[in-house]
């Protein structure tokens, strides 16, 4: 909202020269530039990750390879990162044991990282700390989740409300969600239309993946937001249902995979410590690049499916499944 936009004004000035790191290339006739963030990942944890060069990255649309014009490491002058930490207010209070792990993670962030903190409930976000470079201030904003349900608990609708109110800039924009991924609003007790006509007049409470997972994924990809998650169990009957728990985890995994993020979990169990997850997330931040390539626009702006890969040995690239391409002129 207005508070979120206001806190970013000073930061906008600080990073306004970032655009100079993306000089305009001479585009092929009709082609448009697409900017996004990708992550280089080692296939084996014990192996060294080489630095990517521009010609190491391949972007493919259908059977056509698209021209990569720039690959810029997200370090130094281009290290700016806006990281919003979203905590589900339906989480069990036992997650409080892990809050210190998150505080230490926040405090260890480099100066170029802005941190925001919010709690998810009622299909929205209660922002307790707007984006700030003061990491100690952000760490202090963390509190125990309330540990109860509201009338509209959907982590995916909460994410959508955050992303839609997030001013766009040429910096990394990432979210860390701490949640069980269960849509207690529309996923736990599906409507007849979700179940399908074959179920007949008798109601079945079989949970389904939230219909808002796809919407959250598409909106995040539309606005270049990478979504990571740490799985933690909430309260209520849904949190005692193995089916609900598994579907919630599947929704988080799908969302992370499609936006180029990572879903951290120990199956559907609570982790003793978040520290290994957060250390892995830090490695992700340190292995990111700004990628610029030329895409063929359609008659209307929209998401286009692309595949981003590398032929380097033992290296994988995590990237969004789709990119937003503006309309042709």
Regions found by a protein language model. Give the residues of each.
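N-terminal secretory signal peptides that target proteins for export/translocation
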Residues: 1-4
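Bacterial N-terminal signal peptides
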Residues: 6-17
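Scaffold/interface architecture of coatomer-like assemblies
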Residues: 22-329
